[in-house]
Amino acid sequence: MSLHLIFSPAGARACLHRWSADDRILLLGDGVYAANQFAQSHVPANAIYMLASDAEARGMTASEQGGIGLIDYKQFVGLTEKHSPVVSWKD
């Protein structure tokens, strides 16, 4: 059960080809702009999370996220503790 950290929209595209049903995805930094890509993909919304502070810093609101869960840093740490490996995707 992997945790995929998405730091850019390009990273999101690469991750979509390697995602498995028991994996989880976290959008961070500019990766939050990829929320729409995931909303239109085969990945269920309950498998995707977004760092709330990064979404807020980019002017995104919870209602715009299409069911993607907004989490804080404490919850981020919890995800890293529950999933292995943790894979980072950027460009």
Label each region the model flagged.
Residues 9, 22, 34, 78, ...:
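Active-site-adjacent betaalpha module
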Residues 2-13, 25, 29-31:
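Short, glycine-rich nucleotide/cofactor-binding loops
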Residues 7, 52, 88-90:
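Short beta-strand segments
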Residues 22-23, 45-46, 83-84:
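Short, well-ordered alpha-helix to beta-strand connector turns
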Residues 32-44, 56-63:
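N-terminal beta-loop-helix "entrance" segment that forms/cooperates
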Residues 62-91:
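C-terminal structural segments of small proteins and small subunits
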Residues 25-31, 46-54:
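Short internal beta-strands
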Residues 13-18, 36-40:
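Short, T/G/N/S-enriched strand-turn elements that build extracellular solenoid repeat scaffolds
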